Amino acid sequence: MEKKILEQLEFEKVKEQFWPYLQTEQGQLELDLLEPIANKDKIQAYFTELEEMAAIFVEHHHFALGGLSDVSESMQRLDLEADLSIQELLEVKKLLQVSAEACRFYADLENVDLVALKALFEKIESFPSLQGSLQAINDAGFVEGFASPELESIRRQISNKEHASRQLLQDILKKQAAYLSESLIASRNGRSVLPVKNTYRHKVAGVVHDMSASGSTVYIEPRALVSLNEELTQLQTDERHEIGRILHELSEQLRPHSRSLRNNAWLLGHLDLVRAKYLYMQAKQAAVPVISDDKSLQLLNARHPLIQNPVANDLHFANDLAVIVITGPNTGGKTIMLKTLGLAQVMAQSGLPILADKGSRVAVFNGIYADIGDEQSIEQSLSTFSSHMTHIVEILKQADSDSLILFDELGAGTDPQEGASLAMAILEQLRLTNIKTMATTHYPELKAYGIETAYVENASMAFDNVSLKPTYRFMQGVPGRSNAFDIARRLGLAEHIVKEAQAMTATNHDVNRIIEQLEQQTLESRKRLEHIKEVEQDNLKFNRAVKKLYNEFSHAKDKELEKAALEAREIVDMALAESESILSQLHEKAELKPHEIIEAKHRLKQLVPEQSLSQNKVLKKAKKWRAPRVGDDIIVTAYGQRGTLLAQLKDKRWEAQVGLIKLTLKEDEFSLVKLKEEAQQPKKRAVKVVKKAATGKGPRARLDLRGKRYEEAMQELDAFIDQALLNNMSQVDIIHGIGTGVIREAVGKYLRRNKHVKSFGYAPQNAGGSGCTIANLG
């Protein structure tokens, strides 16, 4: 493809319009390198990707990938055995996160058939182990203490030393307050110092680090603090060395995967570019064109992408039509129409949507050539005509039957008669070699050429005779006409002068009258066509509205069913609470035995409806997210640290990467990071009472509620107390942990309400403290 045409059509400015919709630097890089191609299959693949992205957005309106930096240089540094900086590791961490999210998104994608994008999604790799390791660096770029035992130890020592240093300074501050200009601890050269009055500088033993501008205050590091600060400085040096070692270790883990990570970045960048194309298409009301099997083109309501509020025009370039000649005066929009065709074709062959209506067709040309604008060369001392002709000669040498040529004001810049003759001769040569060409001209001689010559068609830009302004409407099949007499008359030129001029060009006046009639017929046909299009658009909008209403109705119905189920459950809960009160009163009257009470409660609980709706698509989908999966981010309950699941082991155990450490965890020892966002159904679990060795206080049992959801915990607690009563337990332990306090408070509330609980309180500090509640039954 000739580079010059991309400059003349300002293709770079068109590409800039896609920038706001991009989220990744890799997508930006791919867009920057984007140029027209002549491979029909590849262009069709681009269009298929775009259509599939549109289908994704129908189901997922907010599909996004997240901001990604270009990691290509970082991967090159890894290949050269260099270690990555914290910032580079953060960028790789983000890449791993987005890769994992893309894999999960694709795994959960429903109701969308993908072909082209399927290949992209399935090539994206997830790296849970690497993702877990890089949790050692938080999003602010801080290396966490759990990254290594050594770093944690060093930071603990630093904290202790800093505390001791502050304590010592506070003591000195109190003892020598009389010698200080201010009662505060300052910092100079990274050292903690005291602001001492210069007159008392010898009263405070230590090292002088600075002096105030007035000289009245000296900043002294007390001698007693020097050794502490030196130890602290050494520890800070050790911390930096350990962080460097951790960065090296993380880089070593990434190094074998540099190629895969680079490939992931490209795949995500390409998906981002496809997403940007779709968003541009929606914002600009653009469309994916159909690719013709031949060289025919059909642009429906085509607009120039770089013009504010452009006039939309139709263009039909049949396969057997070789040349379209746009005639008429300047400033009517001929050049804009020429560029509109050129840009539509260039954008389409670059895999971009075009600013035209759905149903538009484009061809695939091996070469697109143009001679547009003023090409005068001062350096070569060439005239405008010579410059244009030099370029035209080069185009004629290169073009063939698989080319598209655009000429603006062909033959201009020389004697009108000679220019018109040259223009006709050039167009005739292109017609004979079957090279699709669109040319603009203001030479009237070319109108006759367009009428008399086969496979050549005239066209023009419409002119409003009332306002004396161009309408920028493209009139295909109608040659341009002169409006000089009408304009002169309306501007006030004497009528006898206008008539005398018309008499001198009587023949041309007749031609203009015929052209005017053709224009009128064309305008009427266009109005009828636009009316038909409006009706079609109204029908399309109606169909979309009906579909939207149906979807909203279905969604509302599901919501109402959920609401009804919740209301029913609330009613049953109230009934259960009331029954609990009644049964308790009966028990106090000794009218029922404990096992009979529990059996009655069980029968009442059977009245509770299932919480979930089996037909509810929303809850069905949420259910899929409930089970842990390899690559999920987790929070380890015991440490409160974040990690990533590596592999599933037996007995519901998982291998997880937390910082640089691998752990084996049970499913109840961690929680999924996004668990709170997911709708889950409570599982029915049998509550097992674990008897402990009898003590002086009688048999005891223990219930562990850590990691349980509120409703699940309350169900298990209720069943547990029932079982304890049946087993004549006098005391039970309920382990709920500290956490957010929600379960702990709920346990207390339940025990206060239960008539069979005599008393309860937190366990001793050595037996769980506020993380465990001991209840006495009776």
UniProtKB/Swiss-Prot annotation:
Q: Which residues bind ATP?
A: G328, P329, N330, T331, G332, G333, K334, T335
Record-linked SUPFAM superfamilies = DNA repair protein MutS, domain III, P-loop containing nucleoside triphosphate hydrolases, SMR domain-like
Annotated EC: 3.1.-.-, 3.6.4.-
Q: What are its GO biological-process terms?
A: mismatch repair; negative regulation of DNA recombination; rescue of stalled ribosome
Q: Name one Pfam family in it.
A: MSSS
Give the molecular function GO annotations. Answer: ATP binding; ATP hydrolysis activity; ATP-dependent DNA damage sensor activity; endonuclease activity; mismatched DNA binding; ribosomal large subunit binding; rRNA binding
Q: Mind listing the UniProt keywords for this protein, alphabetically?
A: ATP-binding, DNA-binding, Endonuclease, Hydrolase, Nuclease, Nucleotide-binding, RNA-binding, rRNA-binding
PROSITE patterns recorded for this chain?
Answer: DNA_MISMATCH_REPAIR_2 (PS00486), SMR (PS50828)
Keyword Cytoplasm included in the entry's annotation:
no
Q: Where is the Smr domain?
A: 703-778
Q: Which domain of life is it from?
A: Bacteria
Subunit organization: Homodimer. Binds to stalled ribosomes, contacting rRNA.
Family affiliation? Belongs to the DNA mismatch repair MutS family. MutS2 subfamily.
Role noted for this protein: Endonuclease that is involved in the suppression of homologous recombination and thus may have a key role in the control of bacterial genetic diversity.
**Per its UniProt record, what PANTHER family does this chain match?**
OS10G0509000 PROTEIN, OS10G0509000 PROTEIN-RELATED
Protein name according to UniProt: Endonuclease MutS2
